[in-house]
């Protein structure tokens, strides 16, 4: 299909000149008349590698129909309305060399606008937003204790024994002892007892 002079459509790039290519016409667009009273027609054409939009000036554009196999020489490619377009040059020629018998590829459209892909810059070393510095889950405290309760820092001198918390216990109260009362035997006075005996002794 391609000789030394012709290139496949997939290799056409913006700014490329002296393009020689063979393609089959797929669609014919509406003619546009310029201020210089020149007529230009847009075509969608394809070959086995890709398809592209072609603008052909003046009389050759009027003679081309869908299904024609065309050889275009000394064309150039540029961007028009964000689309890659192939143009017939002033010194170029357009030849019809056949009809219908050509394989073409429409899945690769060189004239589709190329949208710039936005790439998100991810920094794996950065701490994700919303996570605490300790690495815990959002809403949970980092290692060390519950939220809002400060943990005491205990610093021990090197070589000192571990300090144990001293617990002071209050001494147990002694059981209360009830006071004992001493009862002395009462002395009978008057007539009874020793007084009476004494009197008897004196009488004897």
Swiss-Prot record:
Record key words, sorted: DNA-binding
Skewed-composition ranges (Gly residues): 187-198
InterPro entries named among the record's database cross-references: NA-bd_OB-fold (IPR012340), SOSS-B (IPR051231)
Molecular function via GO: DNA binding; single-stranded DNA binding
Region feature Disordered, mapped onto this chain: 115-204
Organism domain of life: Eukaryota
Biased composition (Low complexity): 122-131, 139-183
Gene3D superfamilies assigned to the protein according to its UniProt record, in alphabetical order: Nucleic acid-binding proteins
A Gene Ontology term for the protein's cellular component: SOSS complex
DNA-binding region, residue intervals: 24-94
Keyword presence, DNA-binding: yes
Family: Belongs to the SOSS-B family.
Protein name: SOSS complex subunit B homolog
